[in-house]
Swiss-Prot record:
Record has Transcription as a keyword: yes
Gene3D superfamilies: RNA polymerase, Rpb5, N-terminal domain, RPB5-like RNA polymerase subunit
Name this polypeptide is given: DNA-directed RNA polymerases I, II, and III subunit RPABC1
SUPFAM superfamilies per UniProt: Eukaryotic RPB5 N-terminal domain, RPB5-like RNA polymerase subunit
UniProt subunit comment: Component of the RNA polymerase I (Pol I), RNA polymerase II (Pol II) and RNA polymerase III (Pol III) complexes consisting of at least 13, 12 and 17 subunits, respectively. In RNA Pol II, this subunit is present in 2-fold molar excess over the other subunits.
Annotated organism of origin: Caenorhabditis briggsae
Example GO molecular function: DNA-directed RNA polymerase activity
A Pfam cross-reference name: RNA_pol_Rpb5_N
Function according to Swiss-Prot or TrEMBL: DNA-dependent RNA polymerase catalyzes the transcription of DNA into RNA using the four ribonucleoside triphosphates as substrates. Common component of RNA polymerases I, II and III which synthesize ribosomal RNA precursors, mRNA precursors and many functional non-coding RNAs, and small RNAs, such as 5S rRNA and tRNAs, respectively. Pol II is the central component of the basal RNA polymerase II transcription machinery. Pols are composed of mobile elements that move relative to each other.
One Gene Ontology term, aspect cellular component: RNA polymerase III complex
Family the entry assigns: Belongs to the archaeal Rpo5/eukaryotic RPB5 RNA polymerase subunit family.
Gene name of the encoded protein: rpb-5
């Protein structure tokens, strides 16, 4: 069925972008997962989404951070076209049972206002992020117009501010809702190094504070 073929392709692309995203945040993802071709995805999960092969719940991802295996994160793909508060509660229940405090929710078309509100209410105990499927069809960091972004550690940030005798407030800013900031899961107060090619200097580096 043509619809199944298209939907299988979409789910493969979306899951691939999510795996790249959590890998770029420092979570452990096997190289064969990052490189998984469409055919392998079909063999693993199925190619008939209309018959729940795969069901979106089959695509759930659980990853641990390279620097701290106790820092784990879920990625959920709920079946509901629009996410309501009931789905958020079910997700938090699963996180509580497994003692995991971070998750990304991949949303098909949107969320109800009460679901969005509940995500805010859960923080900081449960840190939930959400992305629309349409946002994950491509990896924005691979776009030729998006320069390389490197997230700085707290130590690197402190060293930068000391070296240039700066305060946080003197750095240029990047909004937390910026697509690249969302991709990296940046939080307010973090600093990101942006590396652009330069015809004269080879490369041109700027720093931005997340606000």
């Amino acid at each position: 069925m043509a619809d199944d073929e298209l939907e299988t392709y979409r789910l493969w692309r979306i899951r691939k972008t999510v795996l790249q995203m959590v890998h770029d945040r420092g979570y452990l993802v096997a190289q064969e997962e990052l490189d998984q071709p469409l055919e392998t995805f079909k063999e693993t999960f199925g190619d008939r989404p209309s018959e729940k092969k795969p069901a979106r719940s089959d695509l759930t991802i659980l990853v641990a951070h390279n620097d701290d295996p106790a820092d784990q994160m879920f990625v959920f793909f709920p079946e509901d076209t629009k996410i309501g508060i009931k789905t958020i509660k079910a997700i938090c229940q699963q996180m509580q049972e497994q003692n995991i405090s971070r998750a990304i929710i991949v949303v098909q078309t949107g969320m109800t206002p009460s679901a969005k509100q509940s995500i805010g209410d859960m923080a900081p105990k449960y840190m939930l992020e959400h992305f629309l499927e349409a946002e994950l069809m491509v990896n924005i960091t691979e776009h030729e117009l998006v320069p390389e972004h490197v997230v700085m550690t707290a130590e690197e940030k402190a060293e930068l501010l000391a070296r240039y005798k700066l305060k946080d407030s003197q750095l240029p800013r990047i909004q937390q809702c910026d697509p690249v900031a969302r991709y990296f899961g940046l939080r307010r107060g973090q600093v990101v190094k942006i590396i652009r090619p330069s015809e004269t200097a080879g490369r041109y580096i700027t720093y931005r504070l997340v606000v």
